[in-house]
Structures are given as structure tokens and as C-alpha cells.
């Protein structure tokens, strides 16, 4: 509020962007042994940071499908981004703590009737960890350990339940500055274990069906840090 008690934010604004216009292609490839192959490429013009109107890769992967099991190599949604997410008109994600991220990964999935098991090794590309030097790939690159994810999901009709856990191990720095600006080599690591819980319950009300769900919860908490 200003000195007269008026809302300083009560000013309308409007815009029209083409940043999220998408170009993509889906290809069904030939069989490799007993596996069906498919490829997906998708891009928009969001760029990164403040560099707007620049081509950005959203999805770029190859998938090998053996029926019950499948192997994906490339960039797609982070495994912590679950199947339960609000439908919104805006571009902002409407779920708190939703890990809205696409990342390069090697992902294996096994499906048996209503159950699905997922394991993945994930790297960082567009969505980066925050550290002493700001957002950077260096923390996970110097760690030499990718993000490791395992999870299980159950689906029966509209009912969907899932749980997953990830290990993220980073090296925030390899040197420190002491007295008289002397530099010292340090060996520090911080390890975090984000978790995901999802639940989607369809409830019929009259002739319509309403979906009531517990939104995905993902929170990265440091479990331990080691330094020498």
C-alpha cells in the first residue's frame, strides 16, 4: 500500500508471447530384436533464464519397448514429476513442491498388470542445483554421481497411487579461501533424498466425475554432509 492506502499492485498488465509454441515429432521405428523402438523430439522457444525467444529442447529420447519392460535414453520428464498434477490454464505449475523438470536420463520401467516399477539415472541440464556459485552443473559434474531414482506406482482405472525416492549427491566446492586469501583444497559432499508420494482418487458426483487427489510431494532435505 502507498501513503494513501492504495494497492500499488492494483495495476493491470497484459502480454502476448509465442515462447511456448512447440515443434515436435514422434517416430515409430523398426524393431530391434524383440523391442519396438520409438523416438520423440520436441522443442519450444523459451530459451533459458532471461534469454527468451531462443530454441529450447524439451524432449529428445529413444525408447525401447519389450512389452512388460522398457528402456528410455535421452531427455524427458524427471521421474519425480508424477502422473498426478493439476490441470491449469496458466503456464505456471499449480502443485506445491512439484518438481517441474525435464532432464537427461537412462530410465528402465517394468510393468506387471496394475503395477509399475521405475529406476533411473538422471543428469542435470536445464534445471540446475543451487550452490555457492549460483545455479550450475558443476556441483553434480564434480560429484561424478548422477541422481538415482527408484519408484513404484499402482494404477487401477482412475485410481493412481505411487511412491518414489531419489538420491542426489553434490560437491558444492573443491577449494576454500582462508586467512590471508590462502586457498585450500577441500573435499565436501552433500547428499539429499527427495521423496514423492502421489494419490489420485476419482469420485463420481451425479453424472460427472471429479478427481480428488493428494498432490505430489517432493522436498529435498540434506541428510548428511562430509568434509575434510
Place the predicted regions along the sequence by residue.
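Outer-membrane beta-barrel translocator domains and adjoining extracellular loop/strand segments
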Residues: 50-55, 83-91, 128-140, 144, ...
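Outer membrane beta-barrel
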Residues: 1-128, 142-149, 153-160, 200-204, ...
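Detector for outer-membrane/organellar transmembrane beta-barrel domains
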Residues: 156-228
Amino acid at each position: 500500500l502507498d501513503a494513501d492506502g492504495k494497492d500499488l499492485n492494483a495495476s493491470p498488465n497484459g502480454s502476448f508471447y509465442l515462447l511456448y509454441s512447440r515443434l515436435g515429432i514422434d517416430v515409430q521405428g523398426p524393431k530391434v530384436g524383440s523391442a519396438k523402438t520409438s523416438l520423440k523430439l520436441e522443442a519450444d522457444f523459451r530459451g533459458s533464464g532471461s534469454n527468451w525467444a531462443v530454441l529450447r529442447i524439451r524432449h529428445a529420447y529413444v525408447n525401447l519397448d519389450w512389452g512388460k519392460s522398457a528402456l528410455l535414453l535421452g531427455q524427458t520428464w524427471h521421474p519425480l514429476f508424477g502422473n498426478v498434477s493439476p490441470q491449469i490454464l496458466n503456464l505456471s505449475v499449480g502443485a506445491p513442491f512439484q518438481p517441474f523438470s525435464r532432464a537427461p536420463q537412462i530410465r528402465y520401467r517394468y510393468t506387471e498388470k496394475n503395477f509399475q516399477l521405475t529406476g533411473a539415472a538422471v543428469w542435470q541440464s536445464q534445471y540446475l542445483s543451487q550452490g555457492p556459485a549460483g545455479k550450475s552443473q558443476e556441483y553434480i559434474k564434480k560429484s561424478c554421481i548422477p541422481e538415482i531414482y527408484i519408484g513404484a506406482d499402482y494404477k487401477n482405472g482412475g485410481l493412481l497411487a505411487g511412491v518414489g525416492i531419489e538420491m542426489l549427491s553434490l560437491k558444492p566446492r573443491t577449494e576454500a579461501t582462508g586467512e590471508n586469501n590462502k586457498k585450500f583444497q577441500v573435499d565436501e559432499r552433500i547428499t539429499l533424498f527427495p521423496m514423492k508420494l502421489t494419490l489420485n482418487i476419482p469420485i463420481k458426483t451425479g453424472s460427472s466425475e471429479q478427481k480428488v487427489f493428494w498432490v505430489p510431494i517432493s522436498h529435498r532435505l540434506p541428510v548428511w554432509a562430509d568434509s575434510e
